[in-house]
């Protein structure tokens, strides 16, 4: 029942786009030249075109991703998760290569750090392309192609002879690596109903954050070892090719539109009737139409949807802090406490623990969400996702202030600022994962584009923060630099509470949001 209601809400959310498609198609048909019109008289006119449209067999069709066996869904989740892990892992493993890159190419630390920032900037620009691609061609094909090219560019980084090649290739690593990160949330929306989606998104969120958290530790020890900085990229490429191979073997298409087109193609071959087609195949092949409907849609959502803009800005700040910590921890534990490269990254493990605790806490709030869904006749209730985020938004600044003022004094035992990371990790993951759930529930009819808009904004912050974090902590001092970030986090605490109170009214005013 939940799957049917979710599907009906998706149809209502995309009604305006379908109407626009129909109007555009009518104008296209009316522009046929008179010469072509004359030649068309030789061919019979189909009086019942609806009879030639191939559709799925209702909401219970076994080919629909939401109706797949659980084992098949989990297999898809595993291979997509591995691709996301590679993309996140590659973003910050380069931090371990920074000292050697500075020496090898005779550049300052800020220039070397561009290897991280340009990668995350690729994360920001990629969704503008990958979200439309996954709406046009399905989730599988664009993702597989992107993961393969992602691996090729990592090999190019590893074999680069100059700093320009390193930076350009790092950008394209992020650009193509953003494909699975952008696509996966939409694919989860295809496979899981609102009732079960929360736990899957929790796993996805853990992958998104734990990749960047674990890779600096690996990168630090690799950069210091006999392998050298180039192996930070070789290892990421090896991981990527493993994920690529797994996707080719095990991954299956989840997007309903593409599944219908695949069925139509099979039916044409089996029947020999090449008039048979899916409704989506009637779209006019005009660039202006596709550009307006697909390529600008994430940007329009971000600009004109207040809910999406507010939660994406909050997520962007949190994501920026995550990448800012990649530079703050070397200052706190490396420069201040004189820890060596590799060892100075070990406190990231505390953030990792906090992320894992935050993910497991989702299960505690599931009964509350189920209760609200049952009260709403089985329909999703986006605001019921927010209580755990309310806790996270309070815990997050506590961790920031704790880290700032205990890390400020080297004579305080190292375990004290290290433990602050668990609070930061808990806050980051609860804010992030419930934001993703909230967006998917609100924009179920265009979830891939909404997540793309969110990814674009948060990755822009992630690219910017590492560039000024080191200077900020050196100039303001660890205590006040951390406090500045903490005060901003405190200022954002009201966001989930305001959405909990006024979210339903804002959704009623939206063109694309789920209505009560």
UniProtKB/Swiss-Prot annotation:
Q: Tell me a GO cellular component.
A: plasma membrane
A Pfam family for this UniProt protein?
MFS_1
What are the subcellular locations of this protein? Membrane
Kindly list the residue ranges recorded as spanning the membrane.
Answer: 77-97, 111-131, 143-163, 166-186, 198-218, 231-251, 301-321, 345-365, 386-406, 412-432, 439-461, 481-501
Output one GO MF annotation.
transmembrane transporter activity
**SUPFAM superfamilies (UniProt xref):** MFS general substrate transporter
What InterPro entries does its record include? MFS (IPR011701), MFS_dom (IPR020846), MFS_trans_sf (IPR036259)
What keywords were assigned to this record?
A: Membrane, Phosphoprotein, Transmembrane, Transmembrane helix, Transport
Q: What is the name listed in the Swiss-Prot or TrEMBL entry for this protein?
A: Uncharacterized MFS-type transporter C530.15c
């Amino acid at each position: 029942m939940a799957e049917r209601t979710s599907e009906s809400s998706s149809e209502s959310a995309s009604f305006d786009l379908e109407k626009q498609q129909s109007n555009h198609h009518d104008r296209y048909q009316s522009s046929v030249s008179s010469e072509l019109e004359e030649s068309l008289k030789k061919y019979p006119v189909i009086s019942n075109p609806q009879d030639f449209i191939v559709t799925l067999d209702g909401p219970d069709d076994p080919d629909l991703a939401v109706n797949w066996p659980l084992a098949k869904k989990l297999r898809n989740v595993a291979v997509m998760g591995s691709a996301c892990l590679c993309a996140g892992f590659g973003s910050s493993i380069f931090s371990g290569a920074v000292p050697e890159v500075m020496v090898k190419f005779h550049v300052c630390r800020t220039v070397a750090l561009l290897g991280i920032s340009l990668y995350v900037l690729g994360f920001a620009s990629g969704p503008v392309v990958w979200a439309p691609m996954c709406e046009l061609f399905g989730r599988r094909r664009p993702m597989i192609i992107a993961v393969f090219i992602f691996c090729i560019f990592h090999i190019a980084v590893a074999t680069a002879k100059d700093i320009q090649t390193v930076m350009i290739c790092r950008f394209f690593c992020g650009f193509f690596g953003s494909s699975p990160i952008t696509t996966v949330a939409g694919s989860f929306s295809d496979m899981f109903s609102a009732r079960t989606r929360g736990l899957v998104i929790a796993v996805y969120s853990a992958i998104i954050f734990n990749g960047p958290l674990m890779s600096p530790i690996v990168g630090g020890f690799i950069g210091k070892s006999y392998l050298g900085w180039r192996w930070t990229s070789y290892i990421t490429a090896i991981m990527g090719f493993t994920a690529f191979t797994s996707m080719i073997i095990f991954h299956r298409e989840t997007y309903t539109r593409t599944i219908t087109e695949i069925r139509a193609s099979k039916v044409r071959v089996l029947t020999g009737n090449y008039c048979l087609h899916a409704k989506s195949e009637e779209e006019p092949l005009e660039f202006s139409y596709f550009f307006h409907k697909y390529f600008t849609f994430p940007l329009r959502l971000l600009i004109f949807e207040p809910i999406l803009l507010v939660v994406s800005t909050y997520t962007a700040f949190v994501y920026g802090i995550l990448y800012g910590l990649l530079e703050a921890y070397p200052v706190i534990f490396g420069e201040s406490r004189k820890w060596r490269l590799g060892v100075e990254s070990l406190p990231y493990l505390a953030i990792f623990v906090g992320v894992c605790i935050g993910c497991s806490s989702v299960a505690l709030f599931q009964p509350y969400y189920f209760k609200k869904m049952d009260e709403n006749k089985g329909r999703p209730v986006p605001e019921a996702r927010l209580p755990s985020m309310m806790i996270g938004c309070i815990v997050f600044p506590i961790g920031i202030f704790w880290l700032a003022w205990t890390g400020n004094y080297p004579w305080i035992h190292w375990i004290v600022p290290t433990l602050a990371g668990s609070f930061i990790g808990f806050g980051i993951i609860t804010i992030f994962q419930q934001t993703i759930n909230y967006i998917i529930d609100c924009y179920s009819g265009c979830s891939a584009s909404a997540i793309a808009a969110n990814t674009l904004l948060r990755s822009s912050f992630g690219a910017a923060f590492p560039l000024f974090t080191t200077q900020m902590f050196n100039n303001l001092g660890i205590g006040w630099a951390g406090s500045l970030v903490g005060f901003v986090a405190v200022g954002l605490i009201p966001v989930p509470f305001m959405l909990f109170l006024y979210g339903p009214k804002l959704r009623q005013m939206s063109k694309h949001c789920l209505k009560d």
